[in-house]
Amino acid sequence: MTTKEKNKSSNSPPPTSFSSLPDDIVLNCLARVSRFHYPTLSLVCKGFRSLLDSRELHATRSCIGKTESFLYVCLDLHRNCYPDCPPRWFIVSPITKQKLKPIPSVTCQSSTVVSIGSKIYIIGGFVDGHSSRRLIVLDCPSHGWRRLPEMRVPRQNAAADVINDKIYVIGGSSSNNIEDWGEVYDPKTQTWEPVLPTTLDLTVQMSVVPGSLVMSGKVYDMNGLKLNFQKNICLVEIENMMCQTKVCEGVLVWCEPEEDRGWCPVDGLEGLPNRPTSPGYLTSVAHSDRGRRVTVWWESAVLHRLGPKWTKECKTEIWCAEISFERRGVGKVCGFVEWSKNVFTKDDYKTYKLPASLSDFFLNSTIVTY
């Protein structure tokens, strides 16, 4: 390098760092980045973390039409090999990757999950061998958990829904006191108040599935004031009609709540890739796209190869597929695979054994839009 070039280089201004730009420009740039990357960006500096948590960023995203929906799931991946290993929370990455990204987790066995805006609330559950009164919130942009004021009574597998920006929680308690039937949480005041059966109008929630209560898309059988959670049933809107879907003996089935035809298989799913050879292989179904689609989940064993030979050890892959629906005449529903991928592979090898029955690793899920 010549002396002239050195002088020119030394006189050049230093490059402008992104963090030195005005906040309004930084906000406009961050608003165009997927929220999936926000937890990583929040580690850059305190200024970034403050902007990512700000209402201004949320307003900017809404203004330019950049709101996104994310599926959060809680999976018990080590239930057979490591019973003491707690379940983990994951976020499903956006198209086209569709991989499970682990996030900091809390236990949620028999808990109820609802979301408001960018926050996920974990209500009650089975903790340390007992029903719990806890309320924990996950801030999705930062993936940070914090405790909130506890419920009045312990509950597990309670029904919950968001009505007028308040969280109504019903059932799930062993108490026979009518004042413990339900309670409502106000996120603004962070207070709980009792809810009596005579003061809460559940006409809409009880009209979708006759004889049952529907809250947050989940179905609960009613026995007087007691509720029985019907696990693994999702309500889905198919051409302006609400139908129930569930996994029955490894097969995705559907029914119309007001018809007597019973449960029927969803057609068109025979071509799902990398499924086990047995006809019934699905383990769980969960909501997707705010009740218009579902995701189905299953496990697949991949044998380990050592040189030219296959061993008896295998890795377990977690597969997920998103399914949309279309009615085909009377009493027939066809499913369409929007995407299907291996979303997670367990690191540990284990000896392959044909399972005696399908093991349900899927514990909970919710969709967050913000």
From Swiss-Prot:
Domain of life of the organism encoding this protein: Eukaryota
Cross-referenced SMART domains: FBOX (SM00256), Kelch (SM00612)
Protein name per its UniProtKB record: Putative F-box/kelch-repeat protein At3g46050
Keyword Cell membrane applies: no
Keyword hit for Amino-acid biosynthesis: no
Residue ranges constituting the F-box domain according to the UniProt record: 15-61
Organism field: Arabidopsis thaliana
Cross-referenced InterPro entries: F-box-like_dom_sf (IPR036047), F-box/kelch-repeat_ARATH (IPR050354), F-box_dom (IPR001810), Kelch-typ_b-propeller (IPR015915), Kelch_1 (IPR006652)
SUPFAM superfamilies: F-box domain, Kelch motif
